[in-house]
Amino acid sequence: MISYYFQGFALGAAMILPLGPQNAFVMNQGIRRQYHLMIALLCALSDLVLISAGIFGGSALLMQSPWLLALVTWGGVAFLLWYGFGALKTAMSSNLELASAEVMKQGRWKIIATMLAVTWLNPHVYLDTFVVLGSLGGQLAMEPKRWFALGTISASFLWFFGLALLAAWLAPRLRTAKAQRIINILVGVVMWLIAFQLAREGVAHMHALFN
């Protein structure tokens, strides 16, 4: 059964490594050393719920609810555009230290709300966990399925905590004004690129719904 664990771990790692909104947010919180371990835990727990739902039967709900997928897609587009605008606005601020200080004043609950939006309003998360993992893990017998899910979840926990701790460790080098400007520009551009990609997918999806 251990082979199914490593299959799940490898697939989970392959899907989570690319830089996306969730990884960018965890990295940013790590650099700020602001609730970064709590955010890593909440991201990993969110993945646990999504992965379990996808592998153990939740994929059918998404596949049978095209309007739900469309709603999540356009909600994600709006959020990513807003979040990217905030990052670019901070990067372009004439007083970057003051702008960064304002961001640091964000309370715990606002940070948690942002993390939940970054995770649950990203339709790619549902495609990864419900469609990809659901189709591969869902066809296994119950015992191999559990090991496969455990491997995928382990990859998520290891990645998010590793990313948060690494970013916090590198924080002294990455909290300079120049580094912060580059990071905020990178985060803003990534958020907008993903938003435009989602918008294209959303338009195609809506076109398919009405035809």
From Swiss-Prot:
<dbReference type="GO" id="GO:0061459">
    <property type="term" value="F:L-arginine transmembrane transporter activity"/>
</dbReference>
<keyword id="KW-1133">Transmembrane helix</keyword>
<feature type="transmembrane region" description="Helical">
    <location>
        <begin position="68"/>
        <end position="88"/>
    </location>
</feature>
<keyword id="KW-0472">Membrane</keyword>
<keyword id="KW-1003">Cell membrane</keyword>
<feature type="transmembrane region" description="Helical">
    <location>
        <begin position="37"/>
        <end position="57"/>
    </location>
</feature>
<dbReference type="Pfam" id="PF01810">
    <property type="entry name" value="LysE"/>
</dbReference>
<keyword id="KW-0813">Transport</keyword>
<feature type="transmembrane region" description="Helical">
    <location>
        <begin position="1"/>
        <end position="21"/>
    </location>
</feature>
<comment type="similarity">
    <text>Belongs to the LysE/ArgO transporter (TC 2.A.75) family.</text>
</comment>
<keyword id="KW-0029">Amino-acid transport</keyword>
<comment type="function">
    <text>Involved in the export of arginine. Important to control the intracellular level of arginine and the correct balance between arginine and lysine.</text>
</comment>
<protein>
    <recommendedName>
        <fullName>Arginine exporter protein ArgO</fullName>
    </recommendedName>
</protein>
<keyword id="KW-0812">Transmembrane</keyword>
<dbReference type="GO" id="GO:0015171">
    <property type="term" value="F:amino acid transmembrane transporter activity"/>
</dbReference>
<dbReference type="InterPro" id="IPR001123">
    <property type="entry name" value="LeuE-type"/>
</dbReference>
<dbReference type="GO" id="GO:0006865">
    <property type="term" value="P:amino acid transport"/>
</dbReference>
<feature type="transmembrane region" description="Helical">
    <location>
        <begin position="179"/>
        <end position="199"/>
    </location>
</feature>
<dbReference type="GO" id="GO:0005886">
    <property type="term" value="C:plasma membrane"/>
</dbReference>
<keyword id="KW-0997">Cell inner membrane</keyword>
<dbReference type="InterPro" id="IPR004777">
    <property type="entry name" value="Lys/arg_exporter"/>
</dbReference>
<feature type="transmembrane region" description="Helical">
    <location>
        <begin position="111"/>
        <end position="131"/>
    </location>
</feature>
<dbReference type="InterPro" id="IPR023445">
    <property type="entry name" value="Arg_export_ArgO_enterobac"/>
</dbReference>
<feature type="transmembrane region" description="Helical">
    <location>
        <begin position="147"/>
        <end position="167"/>
    </location>
</feature>
